[in-house]
Amino acid sequence: MIKLTQKWWGVVAVALLCFAPSAFANSNLTMTGAGNNVMDGVYVGPYYATVNGVANSPVICDDFADESYIGSSWNITTNNFSTLGSALWGNQTQNYEAAAWLTLQMLSLNGNSSNATQVGYLSFAIWSLFDKSALNGLNSTQLAGVDSWLSKVPSNLTPGEFANFVILTPQGCKNGPGSCPGQEFLMMVPEGGAAALYLLFAGLSCFGAMLLRRRRQAPSATSSMA
C-alpha cells in the first residue's frame, strides 16, 4: 500500500519535471568517465558526468551524430516527455519512450561484467532509434543482437511510465544533430520525493581529451565511445 505522503511526493516530482526545462535552462554538463566497455570501436553503456554540480551521474547517450570528450563541458537544457519539441530529436515520442525503456534494461544489466555484450547491443539499439547510420559498422551477429532488443520494446509504452527520466539536450547546436558541442543524454532521477528534491537542488546548484563516440583507438582495443 502506498502512503498518502508518497503519492503526493510523486505528484510534486512530476510537477517539477514539467517545469524542469525552464528551471534548468542554463544547466551544465561535464563528461567525467565512460567505463571500459567497447563494441565496434565505440564505448558503450552508461557514461558518467557531473550534471548541475552532481558528480558521477550515470547518463545514457542517444546521440550518435555528435561527439563528446572526457573533461569537456557544455550547457544543456533539461527536457522531459512533455517538452520533446525542445529535445535534440524533436517530437519523436515513440522513439524516446523506446530509448527510455532500453535504458532501463541496460541499467539492470550493467552491474555484471558478463552482460557487457548485451549492454553494447542496447547502446546501439538506442542510437539506431534516431540514427540508423550507427549500425553501419556492426557485423551480422551484432546486428542480430541489436534487432533482438528492438523487437522486445513494448508497443504500448506511455510517457507517464518515464516520469523519472530527464533528457539532457545540448545547447548551441547550429544545425541540429551533428552540429552540437556535445551529445544528448538520458538520465534517471530518483523516484518519488527524492526526484523532487533532486530537481530542486540540482537546479540551484580536466581530464585528458578522450573521444566518446567516433570510432578511434581506445586502450587495448580498436575502440571509441558513444
Predicted regions and their residues:
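Sec/Tat signal peptide C-region and signal peptidase I cleavage site
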Residues: 21-25
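Short, surface-exposed polybasic-aromatic patches that bind anionic ligands, especially phosphate groups
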Residues: 26-188
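Bacterial N-terminal signal peptides that target proteins for export
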Residues: 2-10
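Bacterial N-terminal signal peptides
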Residues: 11-20, 203-204
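A short, hydrophobic C-terminal helix/tail in secreted or cell-surface proteins
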Residues: 191-212
